[in-house]
Amino acid sequence: MKDIFQNAFLGSLVGDALSMPVHWYYDTSALDRDYGAIDCYLPPRNPHPDSILWRSRYHPINELADILHDQAYFWGQKGVHYHQFLEAGENTLNYQLAIELYRWIILRGGYNSREWLEHYIEVMQTSGWHDDTYVEEVHRNFFTQYARGNKPMNCAVKDPHIGALSQVPALIAGLDALGVPNPDDLTEIVKSHVALTHNHPESIEAAGLLVQLLCDLDEGIPLRQSIANRAVKWIGASTLKDWEQRPDREVVGRKVSTACYLPESMTASLHFAWKYAQDFDKGIQANARVGGDNCHRAAVVGGLLGGTLGVSADWLLELKAMEALRCDKPL
């Protein structure tokens, strides 16, 4: 196995777990007041001042679409934190699925998209499989389509959100563990995997870019050079050089949105990866502190910085996923 791909996966998990308590904070004053510097894993607290769960609704059309289970009780209530029952150092649902994907690939000894969708459906329909309150719209839409009788391969929606990338580092790490190092093969598999749920050109293209950047790191190409060469459509090197001189909240919050929508969420992620190309800790902390969809940006920020710099043991000691990643236990 290649350290770069394995560390990229771990970096994405660390970045998500660090961001988790301030996920979808848009009022940065409230973020600072509630959580301070965010230089270590912290537990979430209610109330969440920017939570929109009070106006979120999901009514499964039948039992096949029931993926909220006991958490449905909290939907429609004000101030509920999206991840209220997670512990400090624990990952959000999309990254718990990423961990499951990684273990599933290794324990099976291979990857098959149809069989993965069957496993995805099984775990999401299992009450208590996870303890996260919020389930993203892409999952709700997928299971609505599935409950209507559509085949799993035909349940994807056109979803242009950076959450599409949350499983990419895990998928690459799993394939790498099985000896699938060819960049072209990795890119094709990753794009097809993302399209299973987020079948939108922006999501698929962003996934392809992340694969290319990680493969460049594996070939010894410096991160900034790779971004400058590969990410021209998303942002130019001259702009990145300008932005690295500015406060992060001026860049991500004013120049580009902190929200989940592509392409701006990818541009924001590339800013952090560029600016903090020599400092993993500062990069994931800066990403967390601007709020918004920091958890899903962590697939890019934590993934690229973890891949190029590695992840220190200090972050891994308190990362709950380290136990979940063990492959000596059955799925």
Which positions does each model-derived feature cover?
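Structured, active/binding-site neighborhoods that engage oxygen-rich ligands
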Residues: M1-L331
